[in-house]
Amino acid sequence: MSKSGVLLLNLGGPETQADVQPFLYNLFADPELIRLPFPFLQRAFAWAISTLRAPKSRRNYAAIGGGSPLRRITAAQAQALQAQLVAAGYDVPVYVAMRYWHPLIESVVQQIKSDGITRLVVLPLYPQYSISTTGSSFKLLDRLWAEDPELARIERRQICSWYDQPQYVQAMARAIREQLDAFEDPAGVHVLFSAHGIPESYVTQAGDPYQQEMEACVQLIWREVGRPNRHTLSYQSRVGSVRWLQPYTETVIPELGACGVRQLLVVPISFVSEHIETLQEIDIEYRELAHQAGIREFRRVPALNADPLFIAGLVALVRPHLLTSAPAFVPAAVGGSLLER
């Protein structure tokens, strides 16, 4: 007898100050995130960089309450998704797994196996595909399935990217309009879409579709917003000295201030949950940067979290794969599309 389940994937985040260094180690030990010319150096590099960055990172997490809310918010998203699936006639469990912190993918997959799941729909909570996010998690799942004959009997249906999902686009557009209307002069607001950056070489050399999907996503959302405001796309959270996708958010904000922008709305376009990049990097660092640049009114669009319209979009993504007659899918080599298995 078949038994379906849904697995939500996310990055993970440290929940206490003690978690910060081991979380960073897991992050930098992933060769899909940080690519070194000599793979045997990966673990040593991860230990060194996590040790060096931990003090500053702890201060950043302390500024937002001591730890990341990502696990709690993702659990709320899973509960909301399960409730909407049940209402639609699909009584299936929804699991949450994180790539770099607990609950780790490896342990959650064992729970899925113990629960007797025979068909698993895998939904990364990254709207746009990247080698470094969805791709990394899918590679880990591929390895786990290859190593365990019992897992190999579980049919996996993986959703690569969903930046163009209609309800997601509508939910983002609605949130933007609500924040625009809160400004003193809504028509005079400049809208800055700030996406998480990736190394430029991922796009130019490895064929990562992230930038293309991000630009298409912004166009879809802006069309749905239906306002004449000027808008810009930039990239944040750069690590290291290599060239990442540009323009950088920390460069764009002072440039906008120098051009006379006095009202700025930041849209965290690649984040569907509040975490360190929204609560600390945007709300604290970029807000201060904006004020220094002469921007007198600064707002941010909240992450969608468990917004019912957004969750309805996740239901629409998952539901076709719960049907017994639907074909199973696996990600293409690069991503962004689906191949029938």
Curated annotation (Swiss-Prot):
State the superkingdom: Bacteria
Give the location in the cell: Cytoplasm
Q: Which UniProt keywords apply?
A: Cytoplasm, Heme biosynthesis, Iron, Lyase, Metal-binding, Porphyrin biosynthesis
Task: Give the pathway listed in the UniProt entry for this protein.
Answer: Porphyrin-containing compound metabolism; protoheme biosynthesis; protoheme from protoporphyrin-IX: step 1/1
Q: What is its main location?
A: cytoplasm
Q: InterPro entries, alphabetically?
A: Ferrochelatase, Ferrochelatase_AS, Ferrochelatase_C, Ferrochelatase_N
Q: Which GO terms describe its cellular component?
A: cytoplasm
E.C. number: 4.98.1.1
Query: Which SUPFAM superfamilies does the entry mention?
Result: Chelatase (SSF53800)
Please name the GO terms of the biological process aspect recorded for this protein, alphabetically. Answer: heme biosynthetic process
Q: Indicate which residues the UniProt annotation says bind Fe cation.
A: 196, 277
| GO MF annotation, one | ferrochelatase activity
UniProt function note: Catalyzes the ferrous insertion into protoporphyrin IX.
**Family of the protein in this entry:** Belongs to the ferrochelatase family.
Kindly provide the name given to this protein in its UniProt entry.
Answer: Ferrochelatase
Q: Source organism lineage?
A: Bacteria, Bacillati, Cyanobacteriota, Cyanophyceae, Synechococcales
